Regions:
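A generic secondary-structure signal marking the coil-to-beta-strand transition
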Residues: 46, 63, 83, 115-118
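Conserved catalytic-core segment of nucleotide-activated headgroup transferases in glycan assembly
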Residues: 89-182, 189
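Conserved nucleotide-cofactor-binding alpha/beta core module
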Residues: 1-61, 69-77, 149-218
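Donor nucleotide-sugar binding/catalytic pocket of nucleotide-sugar-dependent glycosyltransferases
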Residues: 63-75, 80-95
Length: 218
């Protein structure tokens, strides 16, 4: 194991080549805190994009992307510069070895009402468009006492989403925002919801996987 967090991209790539790494896998693509510069410097003869960024890198230094036919249907292949390696079923690797969190918080401790149906979407707020938000608000209006549990991405998104709920005739207090937490508590939180609502244009990936693993319908 080498801690290379503070090293420049070029130095990391040179270190990888000196260790005769055959395949380098990029798990983050163009997402936050990613380091595509390492791959631009050719850390390995074969470089693969996987899991964290399902779009094309659009770069000649990424040779392959691992996917399935749901993630990249045949009609979307033309939008990818990488060669696509298709898994036979699902491209995400799932297992049952993760321990379910022992800590258990009450609904009140999580900011939820003691009774009532809990819809949730823990995707980043920027994935929410007016189309699905309209649907979600109609759900809240038809399911008495229900709430929508969202991820707190930033204060501006929270203010704007509450404002949009109010313009649709709903009490903005029915939108509950969850603070960032560690992975164990995050899994425990998911298990407290009743239904995960996905976003249309930019779907949930690992989060949907986690929800299903916790027994939460998506």
């Amino acid at each position: 194991f080498y801690n290379v967090g503070k090293m420049p991209d070029q130095d990391i790539a040179e270190l990888a080549r000196s260790k005769n790494i055959d395949i380098a896998i990029d798990l983050t693509g163009y997402t936050r805190n990613s380091r595509p510069g390492i791959f631009a410097c050719r850390a390995a003869p074969v470089q693969v994009s996987y899991l964290g960024y399902p779009g094309s890198m659009g770069a000649n230094f990424v040779d392959y992307i691992i996917a399935d036919h749901t993630l990249i249907p045949e009609q979307s292949q033309k939008f990818y510069s990488e060669k696509i390696v298709y898994m036979p079923h699902c491209y995400q690797v799932s297992d049952n070895s993760r321990p379910f969190p022992e800590a258990d918080l009450s609904r009140a401790e999580l900011g939820l009402p003691e009774a009532g149906f809990v819809f949730c979407c823990f995707n980043h707020n920027y994935k929410i468009t007016p189309r699905e938000f309209d649907i979600w608000m109609r759900l809240l209006s038809r399911v008495e006492g229900s709430v929508l549990w969202l991820r707190r991405s930033n204060e501006w998104a929270e203010v704007n989403l509450k404002k949009e709920a109010e313009t649709r005739g709903l009490d903005p207090g029915r939108l509950v925002f969850a603070e960032k937490c560690d992975y164990s508590e995050y899994l425990m939180r998911i298990s407290k919801a009743d239904l995960f609502l996905d976003t249309f244009h930019y779907n949930a990936g690992a989060i949907a996987n986690d929800a299903l693993w916790c027994g939460l319908p998506v």
